[in-house]
Amino acid sequence: MAIHPTAIVEAGAQVDPSCEIGPFAVIGPLVRMGPGNSVGPHAVVTGRTTLGASNRIFPHAVIGGIPQDLKYRGEDTALVIGDRNTFREFATVNLGTAGGGGVTRIGSGGLFMASSHIGHDCQVGDGAIIANSVAIAGHVLIEDHVHFGGLSASHQFCRVGRLAFVGGMTGVAMDVAPYCTVAGARGELAGLNAIGMQRAGLTEEQIGRVKQAYKIVFRSSLGLAEAIAQLEAELAGHPETDHFIAFLKGSQRGITR
C-alpha cells in the first residue's frame, strides 16, 4: 500500500494494500476500498462508503459527504461505488438518506468531471459521463450510459433513461426517455441519440424500432397512455422497446416531450 506520510487513514478504514493514497488525503473510519483505487492529494473519502476496484479520485474531490438535506439527522446511511470510475477535481458525491432508501449508488466505468455533484439517494448506472459543473439533485435515477453535458442540472426525483443525452446548460425537470436527447434551459426534447445508440452497439434493426417508438410517442397526436398502448401492440417483445415502454409506464413526474 502506498500511503503518503501526510495522508490520514483513520482507524477502522478497510483499504486494500494495492491502493494509493496521496498527500493530505483523508480516508474516514467507515470506508471500505477494494483493490487498485487511487486517492489524489487533498481528496476526502468519508462516511459509510464502499468502493470497488480501480477507481480514481482526483485532488479535492469529496466522496461520501453527508447529504445536503435539512431533514438529515445523522442517520447511518451509505454510498456504494462500483469499479473503474473517475472522479475529477472537486467532484462531490453524497451519502443516502433514511427517507430515500439509505444508499446512494454509482455503477462502474463512469466519468464524473470537475466540480460535478451527485446528490443523496441518486442511483447512477454504468458508463455515466457527467461533465463539468453538472448538478444532480437528490433521488435522481440515471440509467446506463447516460451523458450530461457541462453545466446541466437535474431536478429531484427525475429519471433519465438508458443512452439518453442531456445537452450542456440544460435543466431537466421531468423524466427523459431512454435513447432521447434533451437540450435548452427548460429541457426540451431534441431528438434521438442516434450516435450514442450506434456506439453502444445497437443494430440498425434495433435503432429502427426505437425510431418507430419515438415517432409514436413524440411525433403523433396521441396522449401518453394511448401511445403506450400502441407501442405494446406494435413493438413489444424486443429488449430495446420493452425497456422504453416500461420506462414510460413508470414515470411519476411526466415525460419530457
UniProtKB/Swiss-Prot annotation:
One of its GO terms (molecular function) is acyl-[acyl-carrier-protein]-UDP-N-acetylglucosamine O-acyltransferase activity. Keywords: Acyltransferase, Cytoplasm, Lipid A biosynthesis, Lipid biosynthesis, Lipid metabolism, Repeat, Transferase. Its EC number is 2.3.1.129. GO terms for cellular component: cytoplasm; membrane. GO terms for biological process: lipid A biosynthetic process. It catalyses: a (3R)-hydroxyacyl-[ACP] + UDP-N-acetyl-alpha-D-glucosamine = a UDP-3-O-[(3R)-3-hydroxyacyl]-N-acetyl-alpha-D-glucosamine + holo-[ACP]. Its main location: cytoplasm. InterPro entries: Acetyltransf_C, Acetyltransf_C_sf, Lipid_A_LpxA, Trimer_LpxA-like_sf. Disulfide bonds: none annotated. It is found in: Cytoplasm. Belongs to the transferase hexapeptide repeat family. LpxA subfamily. PANTHER family: ACYL-[ACYL-CARRIER-PROTEIN]--UDP-N-ACETYLGLUCOSAMINE O-ACYLTRANSFERASE (PTHR43480), ACYL-[ACYL-CARRIER-PROTEIN]--UDP-N-ACETYLGLUCOSAMINE O-ACYLTRANSFERASE, MITOCHONDRIAL-RELATED (PTHR43480:SF1). Involved in the biosynthesis of lipid A, a phosphorylated glycolipid that anchors the lipopolysaccharide to the outer membrane of the cell. This is Acyl-[acyl-carrier-protein]--UDP-N-acetylglucosamine O-acyltransferase. It comes from Anaeromyxobacter sp. (strain K). The gene is lpxA.
